[in-house]
Amino acid sequence: MTNLENIDWAHLPFGYMKTDYNVRCTFKDGKWGEIEVTQDETVNLHMAASCLHYGQEIFEGLKAFRGKDGKIRLFRPEENAKRLQNSARGILMEPLPEDIFLEMCKKVVKLNERFIPPYGSGSSLYLRPVEIGIAPRVGVSPADEYMVIIFVTPVGPYFKEGFHCTKVAVFREYDRAAPCGTGRWKVGGNYAAGMGATARAKAAGYSAALFLDPKEKKYLDECGPANFFIVKGNTYITPKSGSILPSITNMSLQQIARDLGMEVEARPVPLEELAEADEAAECGTAAVTAPISEVVDMDKDVHYIISKDGEVGPKVTALYNRLRAIQMGDYPDEHGWVVFVD
């Protein structure tokens, strides 16, 4: 078993660390089986499995936190269950029932409790549920057998900068999803489609690529692997389109913005509107909230300076602090978002 004595919990990367157990559940003969616990990190797949040839693979990401009170909290896991189901229906996979999903999440966290970073470290236990089609298919058709796996790993911030401003780049020759394609579902192929833009952005010194809408190349879409929002005055504005994945973090931040007395708008956001933004950030389970100081349109050499001094703005800071406080149990859970793991 992994020795935890020398782990620096406050400086964890966002990467894989071997933990003790993962949990699995298989759909076969028209029904879901029992939850299985294993220490095996590998999956034995048929060489013609539909996940390998026709992209029947979906996944989720959520986190468990240890509070000052010592209690373990999951943040809105039922929303991840619903989104996984929606993704499954989108590419003709078998939706995992919500009660099984929640039981698997609680079980895998409890089994790996010693890997939950301590309160105050800034790190968390990341859960990665993944569903794959495992039945052999040579012709293009959905499988009739599926496996759901949930593994966990302790992680630090997704971006090495942490909660500090970063710069992002726009490249028009890349799309992460088609206008009526899989962008609204958490399908692995969406992330493969974005790797080229991300690699190019990082090679140029930026933290991520900001995608434009795939139809007109006019409106803001997603930012790297996350949603995006701007603040104008007292208004929280986030892009809305059928190619954007509904972010649970973004949904939560919108409610927090209302709680803080802000207006909220979800609508198409033209790239040029960045010139009017007072603050900007990307948001998601992995990134939580990653502030952005500048967006560079690489094709037109236009620089949208959002933070002149490179510092995080007050509204993004307040949103981030409130969200983190709820997740850690430091602020009352007024909306019933937290699920305890006993």
In which residue ranges do the predicted regions lie?
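Helix-start/capping segments and mature chain N-termini
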Residues: 1-108, 130, 137-342
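Extended, Lys/Arg-enriched charged tracts that mediate electrostatic binding to polyanionic substrates
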Residues: 117-128, 132
